[in-house]
Each structure stands twice: as structure tokens, then as C-alpha cells.
From Swiss-Prot:
Compartment list: Nucleus
Full protein name: bHLH transcription factor RHL1
Gene Ontology MF terms: DNA-binding transcription factor activity, RNA polymerase II-specific; protein dimerization activity; RNA polymerase II cis-regulatory region sequence-specific DNA binding
Domain bHLH: 180-229
GO cellular component: a single term: nucleus
Compositionally biased residues, Low complexity: 127-137
InterPro entries for this protein: bHLH_dom (IPR011598), HLH_DNA-bd_sf (IPR036638), IND-like (IPR045843)
Coiled-coil zones: none
Chain segments carrying region Basic motif: 180-193
Swiss-Prot/TrEMBL keywords: DNA-binding, Nucleus, Transcription, Transcription regulation
Organism phylogeny: Eukaryota, Viridiplantae, Streptophyta, Embryophyta, Tracheophyta
A Pfam family matched in the record: HLH
Keyword Transcription regulation: yes
């Protein structure tokens, strides 16, 4: 080995640099006894050689070879220089280079020659490729985690941008039944129909005696009921302001529009505001018994409890009005007819009307009290009809 290096570098004399090597080796720390027997070149299988102990190992080997055989001093120096050149400059040891055998070729000889020309400069100049730093595995995992996190967080970011300021209010998820569409347009349309059905049901509950199921008939009942309520408000307002004489033309016009103001028959105002003609033959005889029963029941309730009577009339869709107003309406729209209820109900109705004034509550039931002048005595009697 010594002859090989002397042939490659004839100008290199190892014996002339003993002082330099001894000075260089003296700076290397020793972690164990340098006098121990380390002449064996191979490491046992059960002993692990650590890369960070390489300085001490080489120092001990060099001293051992210097003591035992002075002729191998140059070979030890060359071995030391080769190991030093193979080590990274930034103390980061590549585990793959640890098991590589030293190459005593031309590259090693050139490195040794450059070492003696300038030891410090050769370490920094001959191995610039050793100064790169590998990112640790933990950082790479973090970078990958950030990348995957960014991709996973992209859809919520787009959804929040589309939502605008409704982030604080979470929209309830609507589950579609089997066979229903799940696209947003179909869901919105289904919710709209459900809201309409709920509003229609609530509106139907406000109308008394509403028993229609289809929407068209139900809306017709609601329209008629609203018209009747408007008429009642107008009549009561005008009766308070201008008396019964001012109300009679209005009621006559509305009754003629309703088709029930024809002469000859009795006029009964229904719950929808129209005036219906009553036949004096068979229809009057069939409804007389039921009307008499209802009138007696109302009279009994008014004698016992006025509040219960008002609630009963409200359930029938009827109301009470002043006798003077009923007289004006009866005179303008109907002919003279026989009374249908006893006189005590007329007196109670007059008492409830508070001497010609309107109902005490706007929520009072809708009972059209008509009066008729019977005979020559001109006695005012009230007529109740559901």
C-alpha cells in the first residue's frame, strides 16, 4: 500500500511530515483508553461501531501502529487522511457511507495531496456536495399534512363564501322521502307548498262552519265571510255616526246585489253577507221547528249567561245589532211578516244592544236581528236566523 501511494505521488515523503501528523492527532479527543488492543481490523458482529467515535478509533489505531511497527507509519497516515476526507464537513453522517470500503485510487491520492497543501481549504473545497441538508421526516409529513389539509378544507371555504353572512345561522337539512327529488329547486318548491297548506289551514279555522276540503271552495267561503265582516263594520260604524236612517240605503243596495231583496218573501241574512229569499210555503214549514229550537236555546242562554250566549252565536256565525238598525233594514229590504220568536227574546236582544248601541265587543258573533212591524200596533219584534 505504501509503495502504491509512493508510485502515484513520488514527490510525497511520508516520513517528513511526522511532526505535522502528531500535532494534528493530538487535537483529537480520546473517549477511552488508547492503549487498549484495537489491532483487529474487523469489528465483531455483536459490537456496533458508531460513526461519531471514528476520530477516537483512528487516533488509537494510529498510535498502536506507531508503537508496534514503525514501518507502517506512512500507511496509517494515509488511512487516517482517507477517513477524514470521507467524513462530512457538517458532522452529518450518511449511514450508507459508513459501510463503504476506502478507495485508495487516484481520487484519494489527489485528496491527500490537497490536504497537505491546505488542510482546511481541502475539506471545504473537495466535498461541496456534502453540505446539503435533508429535511427531517417529521417536517415532510407536516408539509404533506398541510397539503392534504388545504385540499380537504377547500370545499367548506367555497361553501362559506357562497353562503355570505348566513354562517351564524345553520340551515336545517331537509330529508327527502322515498321517491322525492333531492335537488335544491324541488326541495324549495316542496317547502313552499307545505307553507301554503299550513296558512290555508290556519285561515280555514278562522271561518265558522267551514267544511270544504278543496282550495277553491274554501277560498270562496273565506271571501264571502270577509265581505260580510266588511259589511257589518260599515253598518255598525254608520249606525253610530248617522243613525239607522243612514244605514238603510246601504243595506238595501247590498241586498239588491245579493239577489235577495225581491218583494213578497221574508229576507234572512246569511253568514256570508248576502240576503236569501225564504219561500212562504214548504221551506218555511220545514225550517220553522229548527229555528224555534235554536231561538229558545239562545234565549235561555241569554237569561242565564250573556257571555255563553255570545259564544254560542259566534259559533253559529251570527251577531247582534241594535233594534233601531234592524228596524231600518227590515223596512228597507223586507215586507211585513209574522214573528218567528217570542217577545222575551226581543226584549233580551234589546237589552244586549244597550238601547240602540252596537255590540260591546268587535269579536261578537254574527246574528242578524231583523224586526218586523206586525199589525196596527207597530210592535218591534226581533227575528234571529242562523
Amino acid at each position: 500500500m505504501n509503495n502504491h501511494h509512493q508510485q502515484l505521488n513520488p514527490q510525497f515523503d511520508p516520513t517528513s511530515h511526522d511532526d505535522f501528523l502528531e500535532q494534528m492527532l493530538s487535537t483529537l479527543p480520546s473517549f477511552w483508553d488508547p492503549n487498549s488492543d484495537l489491532s483487529a481490523e474487523t469489528t465483531p458482529d455483536n459490537v456496533a461501531a458508531f460513526p461519531f467515535d471514528e476520530h477516537s478509533t483512528l487516533n488509537s489505531k494510529f498510535r498502536n501502529h506507531q508503537i508496534t511497527s514503525p514501518t507502517t507509519k506512512a500507511a496509517a497516515a494515509l488511512m487516517l487522511q482517507q477517513h477524514l476526507l470521507q467524513m462530512p464537513a457538517n458532522d452529518v453522517v450518511d449511514p450508507t457511507n459508513f459501510f463503504k470500503s476506502p478507495n485508495p485510487g487516484g481520487e484519494a491520492s489527489a485528496s491527500v495531496q490537497a490536504l497537505y497543501n491546505g488542510f482546511t481549504g481541502s475539506l471545504n473545497g473537495t466535498q461541496p456536495q456534502q453540505h446539503f441538508q435533508h429535511p427531517p421526516q417529521g417536517n415532510s409529513n407536516q408539509i404533506q399534512g398541510q397539503n392534504f389539509g388545504a385540499t380537504n378544507q377547500a370545499p367548506p371555504a367555497s361553501g362559506s363564501a357562497g353562503g355570505g353572512g348566513n354562517q351564524g345561522q345553520a340551515k336545517p337539512r331537509v330529508r327527502a322521502r322515498r321517491g322525492q327529488a333531492t335537488d335544491p329547486h324541488s326541495i324549495a318548491e316542496r317547502l313552499r307548498r307545505e307553507r301554503i297548506a299550513e296558512r290555508m289551514k290556519a285561515l280555514q279555522e278562522l271561518v265558522p262552519n267551514a267544511n270544504k276540503t278543496d282550495k277553491a271552495s274554501m277560498l270562496d267561503e273565506i271571501i264571502d265571510y270577509v265581505k260580510f265582516l266588511q259589511l257589518q263594520v260599515k253598518v255598525l260604524s254608520m249606525s253610530r255616526l248617522g243613525g239607522a236612517a243612514a244605514v238603510a240605503p246601504l243595506v238595501a243596495d247590498i241586498s239588491s246585489e245579493g239577489g235577495g231583496g225581491g218583494g213578497g218573501g221574508d229576507c234572512v241574512t246569511n253568514g256570508a253577507g248576502g240576503v236569501l229569499p225564504r219561500s212562504t210555503t214548504t221551506a218555511a214549514s220545514t225550517t220553522n221547528d229548527s229555528l224555534t229550537m235554536t231561538e229558545h236555546q239562545v234565549a235561555k242562554l241569554m237569561e242565564e249567561d250573556m257571555g255563553s250566549a255570545m259564544q254560542y252565536l259566534q259559533g253559529k256565525g251570527l251577531c247582534l245589532m241594535p233594534i233601531s238598525l234592524a228596524t231600518a233594514i227590515s223596512t228597507a229590504t223586507c215586507h211585513t211578516r209574522s214573528p218567528l220568536i217570542p217577545n222575551n227574546l226581543a226584549n233580551l236582544a234589546a237589552a244586549a244592544a244597550s238601547n240602540g248601541e252596537g255590540p260591546s265587543s268587535p269579536n261578537m258573533s254574527v246574528l242578524t236581528v231583523q224586526s218586523a212591524v206586525a199589525g196596527n200596533d207597530s210592535t218591534v219584534k226581533d227575528v234571529s236566523k242562523p
